[in-house]
């Protein structure tokens, strides 16, 4: 039961993050065209996450040797919160927006890796409690959540553009203070709330961490060695 609860809380936390991330990423074009009036600079939104991915992906396991992933996840979320705050307050200042995008994109690998590892840890706990490893089901959760988040967010992106008047032949010069305020509300403030909720859910509801997982693995290995639990491969041989 705890395994299922933990998995669901991780899934909810990640889903909230995924929805916020996809919404904001999806409206970046409108930010550069209609708010900043700098469409030529839009390519920076592809360059920053590309470089961040190359650097942060190999850095995660190195940092995780000394820093628990709960804190790496928290640091990533705080970075995104800073990025959102800067985007909301200084959305018409290109240099500040670029710095904000660094805060926004850099922690993506940390957040995603933490979600994957947290889901993976629940596999051993499930095996310890019921004798079965549900790896395929568990590891398919994150891709499924990405698809759900993407589907939910795609409709939201179009709605944001429509509500803010960023459609048709409109230009940056046509944008009113009301249009910009509407855009920032749905592009930055609403996703910011989702990110904060994601952090709260993960921090207070997800229980399995590295220390607890190590204890689970130790207990599981002891039960496998004693024959109290039969691993899946052995069970398959017995059935055949």
Language-model region placement:
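Membrane-embedded alpha-helical bundles of multi-pass transporters/translocases
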Residues: 1, 5-240
């Amino acid at each position: 039961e705890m395994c299922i609860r933990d998995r669901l809380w991780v899934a909810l936390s990640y889903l909230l993050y995924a929805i916020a991330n996809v919404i904001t990423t999806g409206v970046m074009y409108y930010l550069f065209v209609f708010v900043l009036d700098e469409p030529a600079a839009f390519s920076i939104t592809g360059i920053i996450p590309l470089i961040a991915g190359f650097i942060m992906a190999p850095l995660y396991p190195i940092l995780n040797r000394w820093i628990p992933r709960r804190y790496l996840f928290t640091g990533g979320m705080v970075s995104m919160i800073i990025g959102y705050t800067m985007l909301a307050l200084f959305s018409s200042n290109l240099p500040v927006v670029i710095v904000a995008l660094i805060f926004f994109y850099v922690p993506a690998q940390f957040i995603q890796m933490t979600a994957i590892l947290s889901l993976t840890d629940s596999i051993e706990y499930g095996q310890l409690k019921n004798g079965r490893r549900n790896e395929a089901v568990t590891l398919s959760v994150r891709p499924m959540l990405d698809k759900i988040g993407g589907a939910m967010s795609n409709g939201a992106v179009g709605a944001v553009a429509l509500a803010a008047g960023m459609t048709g032949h409109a230009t940056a010069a046509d944008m009113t203070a009301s249009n910009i305020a509407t855009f920032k509300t749905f592009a930055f403030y609403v996703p910011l709330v989702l990110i904060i909720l994601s952090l709260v859910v993960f921090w207070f509801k997800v229980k399995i961490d590295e220390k607890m997982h190590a204890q689970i693995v130790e207990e599981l290995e002891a039960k496998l060695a004693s024959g109290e639990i039969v691993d899946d491969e052995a069970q398959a041989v017995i059935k055949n």
